[in-house]
A protein has these predicted regions:
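Alpha-helix N-cap/helix-start capping motif
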Residues: 64-65, 82
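Active-site-proximal, substrate-binding regions of enzyme catalytic domains
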Residues: 1-59, 65-77, 98, 102-104, ...
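Short hydrophobic/aromatic-enriched beta-strand-loop microsegments
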Residues: 76-86
């Protein structure tokens, strides 16, 4: 996965981030070979699903539709990037608007109306917390 983030086709902002990752990021290698049944997926998804299974992870962060379907079929709990950011925003760890702006600087794509709806819900949540 690290190689995918550092690839020349990856946006510069992402390559810069992975070149000096935050201290909380732990890079873990697979102990077993990648499951050959996942060969039709991209390398990052194959490795993520295999590692999540190997580690018996409680949660897998993944957005690629085919990978999500297979991971869930294998009993893994999967959350997408937007849901993870929304959860972090709900706990006051990030500012959702800022995170969405940063995502737009990458190759990440999501329906604009979904992101607008999430920002509206975030604003409502903040009002409830204030008042």
């Amino acid at each position: 996965m690290r190689a995918e983030l550092a690839h020349a086709n990856t946006p510069a902002i992402v390559r810069a981030w992975i070149s000096q990752p935050p201290q909380w990021l732990e890079v873990v290698s697979l102990k077993q070979p990648v499951d050959s049944a996942l060969a039709h997926l991209e390398a990052g998804e194959r490795e993520a699903i295999s590692l999540a299974s190997e580690l018996q992870a409680i949660l897998l962060l993944m957005d690629e539709r085919d990978g999500v379907t297979i991971a869930r079929h294998r009993g893994l709990k999967v959350v997408g990037t937007l849901a993870a950011l929304d959860l972090a925003a709900a706990h006051g760890l990030v500012e959702l608007q800022t995170m969405f702006e940063r995502l737009r600087a990458t190759t990440f794509r999501s329906p604009v109306r979904l992101m607008v709806s999430m920002l509206e819900q975030d604003a409502e949540r903040k009002k409830r917390q204030e008042g």
